[in-house]
Regions:
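Active-site and NAD+-binding cores of ADP-ribose-processing enzymes
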Residues: 6-132
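Near-N-terminal "mature-domain entry" segment
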Residues: 1-4
């Protein structure tokens, strides 16, 4: 997502500009779990990754290859797991990655929104990113 754009693309750059080509083909949607549904998430927050024996590269390295391999391993071997709960490397906020098998447990009250400058500019401002 855009966290990766800010975190990895703008490192050490004085001018942090998000151009339309980076966001115009994308959309966003709000969703929640359906009534009576709950997600089973593998909690990678705090020291859990270390307790599970997961290498730190999986959750902290800017090259996402290790994390993608780990997620694929979880997806293929832990069929009861709907996704991953992890801390953002950028903001330290909690993030959830959900797998496609989770879609039947999710509902969305609205249609996807195409990302626009009007939507993104206030969201990106705290990180000194100008949205064109």
């Amino acid at each position: 997502g855009f966290e990766a754009v800010i975190r990895d693309s703008f490192n050490l750059l004085p001018a942090r500009i998000l151009r339309p080509v980076a966001y115009q083909p994308k959309s966003a949607v709000n969703f929640s779990t359906a009534s009576g549904s709950a997600l089973t998430l593998l909690d990678m927050t705090g020291g859990n990754a270390s307790r599970y024996g997961v290498p730190t590269d999986v959750i902290r390295f800017s090259n996402h290859t290790s994390g993608q391999f780990f997620s694929e391993f979880v997806y293929n071997t832990m069929k009861d797991v709907d996704g991953l709960l992890y801390s953002s490397r950028f903001t330290e906020a909690l993030c959830v990655a959900v797998y496609d098998r989770t879609i039947p447990k999710l509902v969305s009250p609205g249609s996807p929104m195409y990302l626009t400058r009007r939507i993104l500019a206030p969201v990106m401002a705290p990180w000194n990113v100008q949205v064109l």
